[in-house]
Each structure stands twice: as C-alpha cells, then as structure tokens.
Regions:
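Metal-dependent nuclease catalytic cores that hydrolyze phosphodiester bonds in DNA/RNA
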Residues: 1-102
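Nucleic-acid nuclease catalytic cores
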Residues: 94-185, 189-194
Length: 194
C-alpha cells in the first residue's frame, strides 16, 4: 500500500526499511508542519526523478519550487555520464524472503562499471542512517535478482539541492548491513513482545 507505506506478502504485514530505522532518527525538534512539507517535497522529487528516468516527465508539470531539484538530478546524470540504459527499475517495491522486511529502493543503476543502488535525498544535511538504508536496499535488490544476473555491489546517496547542485555520497562501511539487521531484530522482537 504505497499511500500508507505498508508492505504485505500473502496478507502478512512486513516492516519497511524506514520503520526499522525510525528509532535511529530523532525529528522531535522539527515542527510537524515542516516535516510534512519536507516529506511531500521528497515524494514529488522522487516522482519527477522516476519519470525523468523513464523519459515520461512533462516539463510543465514540475512545480517551480521543485525545478532546482530536477536541475540537480539532471546535472548528476550529465556529470556521471549515466544514460537511460544504465538504470534498473526505479521505485520497485521488494521484500526479502529470508529476513522478512520490505522496501522500495529508489534507483538501481550501472555506475563506474558496477551495479549500485542510488537513494535520492532532498534533506539539507547528510545522515549516517543513509548508509544503513542503502545496505538494506542492496540486500533487497540482490535477494530478488535471479541467479546468473549481476548483483548490486555499491551504495550511494544522492542529495539534490534546491539551488540545482547535488552531492553524491558513497557508503562503504561494511558494518552497515549488520547494524540494519540488529535494528530489524529489535523491531521484530518488539512486535512480538510489546
């Protein structure tokens, strides 16, 4: 259920990557209206990026306040030399059959001669949680990749800015997946016991 950000497999509700990582992020100091505005902006930018990848974006449909983010996305595509054929399926909901969690990785893509997962962000500041998030997305994609096909190897966050610039951050900490699994175990324990 995209509207509620819920994932079900055979009627069973699975925790999302976002839900699993929620205890690691404290947004209590940010006004709810500001958070909601940022959330809506992020959704709109993700839709624009997805449509741009698929060459389905109608320029006139982009709200003026989102133009800089789209400009940043296109600058990244230009600077990195990534073409349409270099992208996998964007925003494809997946679940992990072994670990029982789900999520929607933003963009699998071929970059620097290797498959990677790219998570698009519109936040003002970098977050260490993004490494954990991309580790979970990498594992989701690889768990759903048929044998004999290329696996995702690298993880990136792409922070798009309103002024049309971007920052690409590679996540290389090998512990990120283990930390995510620890969070998942705690989330599952709480669901059974509290």
């Amino acid at each position: 259920d995209a509207e509620r950000h819920e994932y079900r497999v055979d009627g069973v509700l699975l925790p999302s990557v976002t839900q699993v990582l929620k205890p690691l992020q404290d947004f209590s100091m940010i006004a709810p209206a500001v958070l909601e505005h940022a959330r809506q902006r992020g959704i709109a930018v993700h839709i624009a990026v997805q449509l741009d990848i698929c060459n389905d974006l109608v320029e006139e449909s982009v709200a003026p306040e989102l133009a800089g983010y789209l400009q940043a996305w296109r600058a990244f595509r230009h600077d990195s030399g990534i073409h349409e054929a270099d992208f996998g399926d964007p925003e494809k909901p997946l679940y992990h059959p072994l670990y029982g969690f789900a999520g929607t990785p933003d963009v699998p893509f071929f970059f620097k001669k290797r498959w990677a997962v790219l998570d698009v962000k519109t936040a003002d500041a970098l977050s260490p949680v993004w490494g954990l998030q991309t580790a979970a997305y990498l594992e989701l994609i690889n768990a759903n990749t048929p044998k004999g096909h290329h696996k995702v190897v690298d993880r990136y966050s792409l922070r798009l800015r309103e002024n049309g610039t971007y920052r690409l951050e590679q996540h290389t900490d090998k512990n990120d997946w283990q930390v995510f699994l620890s969070c998942l175990t705690i989330h599952q324990w709480k669901g059974k016991n509290l």
